[in-house]
């Protein structure tokens, strides 16, 4: 008999639509329940009422005695063909944390949730894993169940008396959910275990001791069965999974089946999982319900997994360790670790199909960026008015966008200094701290374009046109110059930086200046063309040399840049 329970929880594994059009974050927890007659004793203010399902099996509707009425259940058909009751338990009913909840790991295997503080365990024995919704959990081989209201019991032959069998074996089919739970995790009992199940594990068998709310202890034995009973039959695969559902999801990687399709406008993108579709839909709606709680950080994200990854930019946590002996590197996400491992194995699974190319890549991102070299596609567009620059890579757009803002997203983990570009941060760490460790660019996943009015606000640009002078290049006091070839291939432009007062003192001739933000003297960029014309562009603190080139180019073409530049 299965008890299927759904809890509203901010860290839920799935979402079901609720009343009022709002989505409810829920978790689905399947456990076995002990039946004694037609109802069960009250446990921590909750009671269970037996209900016979359509297939003849028995399920239980959980009843919160404080409400004075039963919470209505709903029959659902599970992926493996079985049926169970689902019920919504409000978050305040002290059942929001469910131990024994089955979740799918990134490799397709099943783990069972136990809520506890990671800091209470030896960190060397804690392994980070990524769940299917992108969040990170930690595996420990000896954990303590903290909940005092966990419903965890088994049913044999329909009565409690059937449990008093001593050394007798229990049919695994009648206790499948609990047996899987025991086969996966061993739990060390301790003080304050209350009414929880205490499970001790040996190599040959699983010995389980069930502690009910009234204190009766029912020792039993259950033979350990195969943990992964569902095998992939595709040639060359043979992967094993604990449930039919997880096998079915895995098989989509062979078949290419993507049953979840986006119906927003003309999008029609399809996904292998409902969670993937839900995350994608938020790119259309702009919904970002997961907000960073760090002080002075206003970023929010489409998924809880993205938020969790972002938080590590504040904490510096790198829970995913490279398993290769002697490497010692660790990473903020399991995907970055997976790509890193390929530097040890030499694996490059992504091959370019362009005739005559033959290049292969370790990561899907690098492969996609490479393909755009052949196609000429530049899908990433700068949203700042008047810019309209396009890029083949998202990382290039991210790096470009900081020229429009005061943002300095890269911070030194040694001294706290912040930088606009990751290359500048890397140079600082090498020279100031002798740190040559490569810097991950995963922060780029959390780039949120700044609104155009925020970019325009505070912009101070002055440009001077029509400055006559000798052919050639005017050098700065430091003598630094940069040559640039125009698009026509003939007009050589030299870029020279000097301050505005020096420019006025050294040059004579008609000048036309436009000050958009103030009269203060700021450094300018002087561009001298081969035809004798020179253009000086004064840029604000948030502008860059790249912006100066763009503005000067428009001036040389006869345009008059306005505020939108």
Curated annotation (Swiss-Prot):
Chain's role: Transcriptional activator. Activates the gene for selenocysteine tRNA (tRNAsec). Binds to the activator element (AE) motif of the selenocysteine tRNA gene promoter.
PROSITE patterns, alphabetized: ZINC_FINGER_C2H2_1, ZINC_FINGER_C2H2_2
Subcellular location: Nucleus
Gene: znf143
Protein name (record): Zinc finger protein 143
Keyword terms, alphabetized: Activator, DNA-binding, Metal-binding, Nucleus, Repeat, Transcription, Transcription regulation, Zinc, Zinc-finger
Family recorded in the similarity comment: Belongs to the GLI C2H2-type zinc-finger protein family.
SMART domains: ZnF_C2H2 (SM00355)
Cellular component GO terms, alphabetical: nucleus
One Pfam family per UniProt: zf-C2H2
GO MF entries: DNA-binding transcription factor activity, RNA polymerase II-specific; RNA polymerase II cis-regulatory region sequence-specific DNA binding; zinc ion binding
Mapped zinc finger ranges (C2H2-type): 230-254, 260-284, 290-314, 320-344, 350-374, 380-404, 410-433
GO BP: regulation of transcription by RNA polymerase II
């Amino acid at each position: 008999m299965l008890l299927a329970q759904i809890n509203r929880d901010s860290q839920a594994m799935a979402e079901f639509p609720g009343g009022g059009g709002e989505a409810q974050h829920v978790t689905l927890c399947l456990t076995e329940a002990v039946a004694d007659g037609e109802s069960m004793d009250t446990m921590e203010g909750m009671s269970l009422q037996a209900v016979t399902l359509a297939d003849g099996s028995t399920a239980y509707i959980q009843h919160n005695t404080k409400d004075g009425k039963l919470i209505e259940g709903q029959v659902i058909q599970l992926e493996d063909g079985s049926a169970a009751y689902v019920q919504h338990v409000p978050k305040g009913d002290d059942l929001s944390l469910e131990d024994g909840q089955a979740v799918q790991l990134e490799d397709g295997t099943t783990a069972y949730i136990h809520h506890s503080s990671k800091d209470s365990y030896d960190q060397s024995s804690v392994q980070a894993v990524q769940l299917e919704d992108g969040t990170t959990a930690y595996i420990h081989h000896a954990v303590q169940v903290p909940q005092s209201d966990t419903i965890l019991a088994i049913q044999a032959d329909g009565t409690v008396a059937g449990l008093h069998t001593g050394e007798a074996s229990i049919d695994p089919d009648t206790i499948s959910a609990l047996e899987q739970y025991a086969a996966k995790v061993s739990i060390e009992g301790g003080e304050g275990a209350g009414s929880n199940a205490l499970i001790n594990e040996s190599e040959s068998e699983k010995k389980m001791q069930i502690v009910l709310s009234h204190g009766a202890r029912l020792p039993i034995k259950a033979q350990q069965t195969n943990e992964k009973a569902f095998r992939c039959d595709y040639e060359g695969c043979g992967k094993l999974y604990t449930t039919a559902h997880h096998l079915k999801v895995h098989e989509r990687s062979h078949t290419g089946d993507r049953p979840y399709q986006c119906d927003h406008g003309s999008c029609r993108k399809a996904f292998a999982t409902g969670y993937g579709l839900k995350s994608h839909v938020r790119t259309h709606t702009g919904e970002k319900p997961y907000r960073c709680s760090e002080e002075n950080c206003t970023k929010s994200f489409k998924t809880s997994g993205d938020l969790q990854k972002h938080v590590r930019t504040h904490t510096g946590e790198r829970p995913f360790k490279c398993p290769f002996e002697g490497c010692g590197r660790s990473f903020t996400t399991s995907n970055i670790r997976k790509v890193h491992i390929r530097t040890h194995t030499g694996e490059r699974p992504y091959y370019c199909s362009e005739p005559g190319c033959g290049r292969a890549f370790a990561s899907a991102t690098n492969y996609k960026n490479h393909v755009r070299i052949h196609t000429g596609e530049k899908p990433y567009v700068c949203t700042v008015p008047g810019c309209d620059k396009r890029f083949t890579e998202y990382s290039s757009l991210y790096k470009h966008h900081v020229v429009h803002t005061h943002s300095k997203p890269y911070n030194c983990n040694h001294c706290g200094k912040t930088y606009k570009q990751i290359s500048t941060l890397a140079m600082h760490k090498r020279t100031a701290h002798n740190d040559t460790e490569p810097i991950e660019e995963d922060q780029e996943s959390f780039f949120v374009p700044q609104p155009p009015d925020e970019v325009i606000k505070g912009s101070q640009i002055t440009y001077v046109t029509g400055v006559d002078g000798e052919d050639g290049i005017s050098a700065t006091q430091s003598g630094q110059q940069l040559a640039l070839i125009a698009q026509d291939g003939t007009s050589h432009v030299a870029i020279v930086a000097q301050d505005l007062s020096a420019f006025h003192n050294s040059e004579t001739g008609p000048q036309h200046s436009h000050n958009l933000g103030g009269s203060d003297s700021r450094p300018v960029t002087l561009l001298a063309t081969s035809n004798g014309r020179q253009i000086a562009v004064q840029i604000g603190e948030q502008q860059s040399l790249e912006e100066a080139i763009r503005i000067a180019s428009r001036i040389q073409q006869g345009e008059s840049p306005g505020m939108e530049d």
